[in-house]
From Swiss-Prot:
Name of this chain's protein: 5-methylthioadenosine/S-adenosylhomocysteine deaminase
MF term (GO), any: S-adenosylhomocysteine deaminase activity
NCBIfam families membership: PRK08393.1
Paired cysteines (S-S): none
EC number, as in UniProt: 3.5.4.28, 3.5.4.31
Stated family: Belongs to the metallo-dependent hydrolases superfamily. MTA/SAH deaminase family.
Cofactor(s) needed: Zn(2+)
Species of provenance: Pyrococcus furiosus (strain ATCC 43587 / DSM 3638 / JCM 8422 / Vc1)
Task performed by this protein: Catalyzes the deamination of 5-methylthioadenosine and S-adenosyl-L-homocysteine into 5-methylthioinosine and S-inosyl-L-homocysteine, respectively. Is also able to deaminate adenosine.
Catalytic reactions of this protein: S-adenosyl-L-homocysteine + H2O + H(+) = S-inosyl-L-homocysteine + NH4(+); S-methyl-5'-thioadenosine + H2O + H(+) = S-methyl-5'-thioinosine + NH4(+)
Lineage, broadest ranks: Archaea, Methanobacteriati, Methanobacteriota, Thermococci, Thermococcales
Cofactor: binding details: Binds 1 zinc ion per subunit.
């Protein structure tokens, strides 16, 4: 496979080059001009920007089912009065078709990899394989300090671990997924810590999303949520903590020292009125910061191109400083940084890296002129501009059409499911 004459965002410094890309066995074999090699397919990318596949480091894909369900309310009310009651009604088939729809939406914004926690998680895995994206998936554990509930959550988590091991798919990876320090008991968190070491897998969790959450944890345990994770053995390089809006400077230093990752979810944090993540401070302290959409119920899209734009604009207006964050830093949060968190040799277009690539069609009115490809990607591109997508060197979308699934069938089935 050769991608010919594209405008390439090359390497981890995002150098712009007009070049070809040779893909062999799912890996980028060569990047250079006028590549001459045997190829089963040649794609003309002369009118395209070729970018690393984006990584959505925190989402709940099947929550597209709940898009628009509850608006203009704070997080706790949103969860307790709207989301959790509706989730109790969802069946396996709902999760399956909801995931398919969400994956199609994500793919069209250039997402090749995502991190997801939810229930009926086997259905998420099945849909992930069908569409051809790469998922790091976990059963969302919530025990609310109920011993019987904890036993159920442990059983479900172990069952999914066995499922992932059995199917042995390169597209489905297991993560442990305790929901949050305020919904999981100490016993639950300690069990997760033990299993993370035993199974050598990442741990994704919601952390310091709201001011109220931090105050409740302080009152209950006499420490911050980050200190609590440290206490139970979860503060390490395996940790992928979502939101982090109310992290203190001390906690950011702790996360940096532990080589943990924080996932910034700007749209969700703005929509729920949770606050503004201290991005500049986190980056300056050496925290590995990734980017995520959260679920479509609190965003309300899964468009990672939009999320990059919001991440940049939010910091500029919050600090009244247009230079506070650079486009290249934002792009790293959607590529290089989450790849590091997941131990994935992806997020970069370079020889030896996994061929996760997205081609953006530049022949669109809102994408011209091409003065700065990187800033154009951050501030002008949007979901739907991606017309070709590779995951592991396999084509998922070609010239705007899915090769792996029937998009129209998914739309029809989804509409029937939500009737």
């Amino acid at each position: 496979m050769i991608i010919k004459n594209g405008m390439i965002i090359y390497g981890d410094e995002f150098t712009i080059v007009r070049s070809d890309v040779l893909i062999e066995d799912g890996v980028i074999k060569e990047v250079g001009k006028n590549i001459r090699a045997p190829a089963d397919m040649v794609i003309d990318a002369s009118s395209h920007l070729v970018i690393p596949g984006l990584i959505n480091a925190h989402t709940h894909v099947s929550m597209v089912l709940l898009r628009g369900l509850a608006e203009d309310v704070p997080l706790q009310e949103w969860l307790q009065n709207y989301i959790w009651p509706r989730e109790r009604e969802l069946k396996r088939k709902d999760i399956y078709w909801g995931t398919l729809l969400g994956l199609v939406e994500m793919a069209r914004s250039g997402v090749t990899t995502f991190v997801d926690m939810y229930f009926h998680i086997e259905e998420v895995a099945k849909a992930t394989i069908e569409v051809g994206l790469r998922g790091f998936l976990g059963y969302g554990m919530v025990d609310l300090e109920n011993r019987e509930k904890l036993e159920v959550e442990i059983k479900e988590t172990e069952k999914f671990y066995e499922y992932v091991t059995k199917i042995n798919s390169p597209l489905v990876n297991f993560v442990l997924a305790p929901h949050a320090p305020y919904t999981c008991s100490l016993e639950c968190l300690k069990w997760v810590s033990k299993k993370a070491n035993q199974w050598n897998v990442p741990v994704t969790i919601h952390l310091s999303e709201t001011k109220k959450e931090v105050e409740e944890i302080r009152k209950k345990y006499g420490m911050t949520p980050t200190q609590l994770l440290d206490e139970v053995g979860l503060l390490n390089e395996k940790l992928i903590a979502a939101h982090g809006v109310w992290l203190s400077e001390e906690e950011l230093r702790m996360l940096s020292s532990a080589n943990a990752t924080v996932v910034h979810c700007p749209a969700s944090n703005m929509k729920l009125g949770s606050g503004v993540f201290p991005l500049r401070k986190a980056l300056d302290l050496g925290v590995n910061v990734a980017l995520g959409t959260d679920g479509a119920a609190s965003n309300n899209t899964l468009d990672m191109l939009r999320e990059m734009r919001l991440a940049s604009l939010l910091q500029k207006v919050a600090h009244l400083n247009p230079a506070i964050v650079k486009s290249e830093e934002i792009l790293k949060m959607a590529t290089v940084n989450p790849a590091k968190a997941l131990g994935l040799k992806s997020g970069v277009i370079k020889e030896g890296y996994i061929a996760d690539l997205a081609l953006i069609n530049l022949r669109r009115p809102h994408l011209l002129p091409l003065n700065s490809p990187t800033s154009l990607l951050i501030y002008s591109a949007r979901g739907g501009d991606v017309d070709t997508l590779f995951v592991n060197g396999e084509i998922v979308i070609l010239d705007g059409e899915f090769l792996t699934v029937n998009e129209e069938k998914i739309l029809d089935k989804f509409l029937k499911v939500i009737e």
